[in-house]
Curated annotation (Swiss-Prot):
It comes from Mus musculus. The gene is Ap5s1. The lineage of its organism: Eukaryota, Metazoa, Chordata, Craniata, Vertebrata. GO terms for cellular component: AP-5 adaptor complex; AP-type membrane coat adaptor complex; cytosol; late endosome; late endosome membrane; lysosomal membrane; lysosome. GO terms for biological process: double-strand break repair via homologous recombination; endosomal transport; protein transport; vesicle-mediated transport. InterPro entries: AP-5_subunit_s1 (IPR029392). This is AP-5 complex subunit sigma-1. Its main location: cytoplasm. It is found in: Cytoplasm, Cytosol; Late endosome membrane; Lysosome membrane. It comes from the Eukaryota. It is a peripheral membrane protein. Keywords: Cytoplasm, DNA damage, DNA repair, Endosome, Lysosome, Membrane, Protein transport, Transport.
Length: 170
């Protein structure tokens, strides 16, 4: 079962800490109560608890991605956005999986599958017994579809000019 999907920022390797890892989007499937107290804490406290869990996963993904890039000897610009007509290769993108022990940060053990593309990290938080090959294909498909959709928002595309050409009377 997939427990969470998240998209977050990735800082380039070999750079000073110029910013924090930021979670741009997350979706948690199911709820986990705080391990300290079995009583209900209320919606706000549960939301903050889930937010902390997701941020912990994002930081670990960012750390592993930076480590992999540094070990491969990649330059600091490899994870920066590239506004060109060339498609982004998902097969060459840094990726990996790691295991989270029970209590770190989830109550049950989990597996995290991640993919780093440009300056974005995509991650799935899974049960430990999930099919990782199927999950990796799903994560790559999600990332490709999201990047294709977001390509409309890049500075290289002038949506206003395209709209004016398509609707000359307006």
């Amino acid at each position: 079962m997939v427990h969470a999907f998240l998209i977050h920022t990735l800082r380039a390797p070999n750079l000073e800490d110029t910013g924090l890892c930021r979670v741009l989007y997350s979706c948690v499937f199911g709820a986990e109560k705080s391990p300290d107290d079995p009583r209900s804490h209320g919606a706000e406290r549960d939301r903050l608890f889930r937010k902390e869990q997701i941020l912990a996963v994002a930081r670990q993904v960012e750390s592993l991605c930076r480590l992999q890039q540094q070990a491969a000897g990649c330059s600091s610009t490899d994870l920066q956005p590239q506004f060109s007509a060339e498609p982004v290769s998902l097969h060459e993108a840094p990726h990996g999986a790691f295991h989270l022990a029970a209590g770190d940060p989830f109550q049950e053990p989990r597996t995290v599958l991640w993919l780093g593309i440009l300056s974005l990290g995509f991650a799935l938080v899974l049960d430990t017994h999930e099919n990782l090959l199927l999950a990796e294909r799903t994560l790559r498909l999600l990332a490709r579809l999201l990047l294709d959709h977001l390509r409309l928002l890049t500075p290289a595309v002038s949506t206003g000019a395209a709209y004016c050409r398509a609707h000359p009377s307006r």
